[in-house]
């Protein structure tokens, strides 16, 4: 069995020489240099990932981590707790938002139970740590050992999927009340006041946001997470779904493969992943700007600029599914465009 240290040791920086070669190729394609903007930058980023060869991304997969949260008992969500289980089963049926959007993008969806308050669910990968995390307003979400074990299990699952041929990963989550621990994590990692990180989540009444802010503030004061220690923050004020997504990011980076972020929840996990191993950031592809209040703070801290701005806050991996189309487009552009030299065209400043 792998250890967390052994997984982290395999995470390498992007290949700068491969990226330079990709830049030269892009500059010689049938277009003015840089005219495809961030699509070119995405192709260059992908070129630096050792797990990809020839910009071939034919197999894409979104891993959705599902779990319930003890902080639900503080009245920070309006959806019934059982919705986590119901939606997990709906994902198995392929009828949720992420499933429809992923199918449209040619991506698979894997739903993983890391802490749903239910018995084993058919069609769902069982990696359950417990039936819900601890109530972070009154104590830790989990033990440090539970967090480390789940990071290893999630990263190992990702590495296994990579060995089976997956070339692009996306992350998603499912769990009632999970924007509360995510806001706590973002607040801690960015050293921001909880009021700046707490949003309405799944339509939480705006007039009650002060209560949600107070719960997040109490969680941080109660647990005193160490912002310099990603695992400590996950264990004290996170949740099993947030830990699971962090593990997917570590595993994808260890495999030298891209991982497409989703929304606010995934930003919280990305902050943890980058705190655990800074090189993970090289492998992150930001999909969309979440409509959640703390999104900009988190993304600014990560120094990531999302590709899409759709006003979305569904979660599940829905934004990751949309951005899979951009990954395909970047690779199609890189592989299939003709060159200036082939057409005997010379443009000022272009490489023939």
UniProtKB/Swiss-Prot annotation:
Pathway: Nucleoside biosynthesis; alpha-ribazole biosynthesis; alpha-ribazole from 5,6-dimethylbenzimidazole: step 1/2. It catalyses: 5,6-dimethylbenzimidazole + nicotinate beta-D-ribonucleotide = alpha-ribazole 5'-phosphate + nicotinate + H(+). InterPro entries: Nict_dMeBzImd_PRibTrfase, Nict_dMeBzImd_PRibTrfase_bact, Nict_dMeBzImd_PRibTrfase_N, Nict_dMeBzImd_PRibTrfase_sf. GO terms for biological process: cobalamin biosynthetic process. Pfam families: DBI_PRT. It is an enzyme of class 2 (transferase). Keywords: Cobalamin biosynthesis, Glycosyltransferase, Transferase. The active site is at residue 316. Gene3D superfamilies: 1.10.1610.10, 3.40.50.10210. Its EC number is 2.4.2.21. The keyword Mitochondrion does not apply. CDD domains: DMB-PRT_CobT. GO terms for molecular function: nicotinate-nucleotide-dimethylbenzimidazole phosphoribosyltransferase activity. PANTHER family: NICOTINATE-NUCLEOTIDE--DIMETHYLBENZIMIDAZOLE PHOSPHORIBOSYLTRANSFERASE. Belongs to the CobT family. NCBIfam families: cobT_DBIPRT, PRK00105.1. Catalyzes the synthesis of alpha-ribazole-5'-phosphate from nicotinate mononucleotide (NAMN) and 5,6-dimethylbenzimidazole (DMB). This is Nicotinate-nucleotide--dimethylbenzimidazole phosphoribosyltransferase. It comes from Yersinia enterocolitica serotype O:8 / biotype 1B (strain NCTC 13174 / 8081). The gene is cobT.
């Amino acid at each position: 069995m792998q250890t967390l240290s052994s997984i982290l040791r395999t995470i390498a920086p992007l290949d700068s020489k491969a990226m330079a070669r990709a830049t030269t190729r892009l500059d010689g394609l049938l277009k003015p240099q840089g005219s495809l903007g961030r699509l070119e930058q995405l192709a260059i980023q992908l070129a630096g990932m050792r797990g990809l060869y020839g910009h071939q991304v034919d197999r894409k997969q979104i891993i959705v981590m599902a779990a319930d949260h003890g902080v639900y008992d503080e009245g920070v969500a309006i959806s019934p707790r059982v919705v986590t289980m119901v939606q997990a089963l709906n994902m198995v049926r392929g009828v949720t938002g992420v499933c429809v959007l992923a199918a449209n993008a040619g991506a698979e969806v894997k739903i993983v139970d890391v802490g749903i308050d239910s018995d084993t669910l058919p069609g769902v990968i069982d990696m359950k740590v417990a039936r819900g995390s601890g109530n972070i307003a009154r104590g830790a979400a989990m033990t440090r050992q539970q967090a480390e074990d789940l990071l290893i299990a999630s990263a190992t699952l990702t590495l296994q999927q990579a060995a089976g041929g997956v070339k692009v990963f996306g992350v998603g989550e499912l769990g009632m009340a999970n924007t509360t621990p995510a806001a706590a994590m973002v607040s801690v990692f960015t050293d921001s006041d909880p009021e700046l990180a707490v949003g309405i989540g799944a339509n939480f009444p705006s007039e009650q946001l002060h209560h949600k802010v107070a719960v997040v503030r109490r969680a941080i004061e109660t647990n005193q997470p160490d912002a310099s220690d990603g695992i400590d923050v996950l264990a004290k004020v996170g949740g099993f779904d947030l830990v699971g997504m962090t593990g997917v990011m570590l595993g994808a980076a260890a495999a030298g493969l891209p991982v497409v972020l989703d929304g606010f929840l995934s930003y919280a996990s990305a902050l943890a992943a980058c705190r655990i191993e800074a090189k993970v950031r090289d492998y992150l592809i930001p999909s969309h700007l979440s409509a959640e209040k703390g999104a900009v703070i988190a993304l600014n801290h990560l120094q990531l600029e999302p590709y899409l701005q759709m006003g979305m806050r569904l979660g599940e991996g829905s934004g990751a599914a949309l951005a899979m189309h951009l990954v395909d487009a970047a690779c199609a552009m890189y592989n299939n465009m003709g060159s200036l030299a082939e057409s005997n065209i010379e443009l000022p400043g272009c490489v023939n």
